[in-house]
């Protein structure tokens, strides 16, 4: 019963915060707000340069493998449990999934910098 009350309170607060976030912003846009700010000077050229998709893909790949490290960090503490089978199974499935993702990324030439 306590868990149901906790879930209800969490969902209510989350919904309330989402509603407040949609209600509060003022969408007044004008040229000063939408122009880039460069230390008080007018920009010499276009301040909105196109972003290379390669950098974006490398950043996303880095974040995925960084998440792997974050998920595997609790493993030393999990080894102190009486039954290690669920922990080892989960860890091996996670590592296998990420290794398959890395192999797929490699085969699709997503890790090569030259085009």
UniProtKB/Swiss-Prot annotation:
Q: Where in the cell is it found?
A: Mitochondrion inner membrane
Q: Which gene encodes it?
A: MT-ND3
Membrane disposition: Multi-pass membrane protein
Tell me a Gene Ontology molecular-function term this record carries: NADH dehydrogenase (ubiquinone) activity
| Family assignment from sequence similarity | Belongs to the complex I subunit 3 family.
The record's EC number reads: 7.1.1.2
Gene Ontology biological process terms, A to Z: mitochondrial electron transport, NADH to ubiquinone
* Keyword Transport assigned: yes
The subunit structure is: Core subunit of respiratory chain NADH dehydrogenase (Complex I) which is composed of 45 different subunits. Interacts with TMEM186. Interacts with TMEM242.
Q: Transmembrane: present as a keyword of the record? A: yes
Catalytic activity reads:
a ubiquinone + NADH + 5 H(+)(in) = a ubiquinol + NAD(+) + 4 H(+)(out)
General function of this protein: Core subunit of the mitochondrial membrane respiratory chain NADH dehydrogenase (Complex I) which catalyzes electron transfer from NADH through the respiratory chain, using ubiquinone as an electron acceptor. Essential for the catalytic activity of complex I.
Keywords recorded for this protein, A-Z: Electron transport, Membrane, Mitochondrion, Mitochondrion inner membrane, NAD, Respiratory chain, Translocase, Transmembrane, Transmembrane helix, Transport, Ubiquinone
Gene source species: Dasypus novemcinctus (Nine-banded armadillo)
Q: What's one GO-annotated cellular component?
A: mitochondrial inner membrane
Q: Which residues cross the membrane?
A: 3-23, 55-75, 87-107
- Indicate the enzyme's highest-level EC class: translocase
UniProt protein name: NADH-ubiquinone oxidoreductase chain 3
